[in-house]
């Protein structure tokens, strides 16, 4: 039986007691089924030459390493999060390309390949995750690794007009073709990748999803990531902590609109605040009878763009509350802090509306978690951006354009006044999709397809001559 090797920028610690996110749940499920290794950065800076830190529990080994301060800055902060992240979320105006950062990104991917190489066994299958590791298969191929290597992109893949604006776009595209299987959240993302490829080289396609580019065989497929709906339902339905129970009692005559995500410019938070203001302005009958709570803990606080959006939200929240607030009623609560995941599931359950309106998102698991947390007999309503990957599956949500504040305001009004029968029907349809496409099905489909790939032979590998692009000067 093939062993599974998972590679991601960060690894979830084996003693993690908190609620695991989607990637951790899916990866651990796959690793428990096959046995294997989870390899990645420890999240700490230090001496890169130190031996790997290894922990084994059952049939799973966690192996992690430190990054130097310089590599952390170049690979993680400057290239992954100041170039790839904004570009892949259609924000070229925020891209800060610097050649030393690109060189650091390539250097760290090569370093990771060097560290992983001694741990790889002949029949291992390798599953690589996300935008930090786009060149990783290419680095392994250079070192003679012919194992099956799959890649899953958790964030959107941009259209060629966006992607080709990146100075190393051609290098990145050819490196991606060294994976055997490329997985995307949506069909739009898969097609955007292929369109970018076609803009750079000839691509031969067989059976729709088997391709050859630069002499390299690879497959593309769509794997929308899911959640654990049963676990979320259990967390949501449990007894409320005393403070939350008291708050719920105080707000029993107020309808609650709730949002939670990390503080990021891709989430559309300023636009969301303005849409809520439009709701109060266009539908004054709701004043004093609703409350919008936005939880947005700080993320990447050292990046100027994130500092700017935090200050913008603080300003907008104060302005809206000053304009529409009344004695005894505050229309908008903005909390820039972290809350326990299990507590959030309980807040989801007693919320009347879940407001999830990113400007661009690979999937957005918060939308799925909101649905899974609801009481099926009296569910809340999901208002969801058309630019979230989840909108392709959760078609019974109220789908909105987050750039159109009046459209979002109208959807909020409809959600707040929706009859129970319609709420139940819409919720049941979405829950059915979420249960069928849960996190386990996501990883099982990907691993099954990766195992079906024909391994690359050394002869074919030599013929392909991986990473043939000229070095970026």
Curated annotation (Swiss-Prot):
Q: From what superkingdom does this record's organism come?
A: Bacteria
Task: Give the UniProt record's GO annotations in the biological process aspect.
Answer: trehalose biosynthetic process
Q: For D-glucose 6-phosphate, which residues are the binding ones?
A: 10, 76, 130, 300
The coiled-coil regions, if any, are none
Q: Report the pathway entry.
A: Glycan biosynthesis; trehalose biosynthesis
User: Site described as Involved in alpha anomer selectivity, positions?
Assistant: 85, 155
Give me the reactions it catalyses.
Answer: D-glucose 6-phosphate + UDP-alpha-D-glucose = alpha,alpha-trehalose 6-phosphate + UDP + H(+)
Provide the alphabetized UniProt keywords.
Glycosyltransferase, Transferase
Q: Does the keyword Transport apply?
A: no
- The EC code for this enzyme is 2.4.1.15
This molecule's function is given as: Probably involved in the osmoprotection via the biosynthesis of trehalose. Catalyzes the transfer of glucose from UDP-alpha-D-glucose (UDP-Glc) to D-glucose 6-phosphate (Glc-6-P) to form trehalose-6-phosphate. Acts with retention of the anomeric configuration of the UDP-sugar donor.
Outline the subunit composition.
Homotetramer.
Question: What protein name does the entry list?
Answer: Trehalose-6-phosphate synthase
The organism encoding this protein is Salmonella choleraesuis (strain SC-B67)
């Amino acid at each position: 039986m093939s062993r599974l090797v998972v590679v991601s920028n960060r690894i979830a610690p084996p003693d993690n007691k908190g609620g695991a996110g989607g990637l951790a749940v899916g990866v651990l499920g796959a690793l428990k089924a096959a046995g294997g290794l989870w390899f990645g950065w420890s999240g700490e800076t230090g001496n890169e030459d130190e031996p790997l830190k290894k922990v084994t529990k059952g049939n799973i080994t966690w192996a992690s390493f430190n990054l130097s301060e310089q590599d952390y800055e170049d690979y993680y902060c400057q290239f992954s999060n100041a170039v790839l992240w904004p570009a892949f979320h259609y924000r070229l105006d925020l891209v800060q390309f610097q050649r030393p950062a690109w060189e650091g990104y390539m250097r760290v991917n090569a370093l990771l390949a060097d560290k992983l190489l001694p741990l790889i066994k002949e029949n291992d299958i390798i599953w690589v995750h996300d935008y930090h590791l786009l060149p990783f298969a290419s680095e392994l191929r250079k070192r003679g690794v012919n194992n099956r290597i799959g890649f899953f992109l958790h964030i959107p893949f941009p259209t060629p007009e966006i992607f080709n604006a990146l100075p190393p776009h051609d290098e990145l595209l050819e490196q991606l073709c060294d994976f055997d299987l490329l997985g995307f959240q949506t069909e739009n993302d898969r097609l955007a990748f292929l369109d970018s490829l076609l803009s750079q080289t000839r691509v031969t396609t067989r059976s729709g999803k088997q391709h050859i580019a630069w002499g390299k065989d690879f497959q593309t497929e769509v794997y929308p990531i899911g959640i654990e709906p049963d676990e979320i339902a259990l967390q949501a339905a449990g007894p409320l902590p005393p403070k939350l129970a008291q708050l719920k009692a105080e707000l029993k005559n107020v309808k609650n609109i709730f949002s939670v995500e990390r503080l990021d410019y891709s989430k559309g938070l300023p636009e969301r605040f303005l849409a809520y203001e439009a709701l109060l302005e266009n539908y004054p009958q709701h004043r004093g009878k609703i409350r919008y709570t936005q939880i947005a803990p700080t993320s990447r606080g050292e990046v100027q763009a994130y500092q700017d959006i935090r200050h913008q939200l603080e300003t907008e929240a104060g302005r809206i509350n000053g304009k529409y607030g009344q004695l005894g009623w505050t229309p908008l609560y903005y909390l820039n802090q972290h809350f326990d995941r299990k507590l959030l599931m309980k807040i989801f359950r007693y919320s009347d509306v879940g407001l999830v309106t990113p400007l661009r998102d690979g999937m957005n698991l918060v939308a799925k978690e909101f649905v899974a947390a609801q009481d099926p007999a009296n569910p809340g309503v999901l208002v969801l951006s058309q630019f979230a990957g989840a909108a392709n599956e959760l078609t019974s949500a109220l789908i909105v354009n987050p750039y159109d504040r009046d459209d979002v305001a109208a959807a909020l009004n409809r959600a707040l006044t929706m009859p129970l029968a319609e709420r139940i029907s819409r919720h049941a349809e979405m829950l059915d999709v979420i249960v069928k496409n849960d996190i386990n099905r996501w990883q099982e489909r990907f691993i099954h397809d990766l195992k079906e790939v024909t391994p690359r032979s050394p002869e074919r590998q030599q013929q392909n001559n991986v990473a043939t692009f000229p070095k970026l000067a």
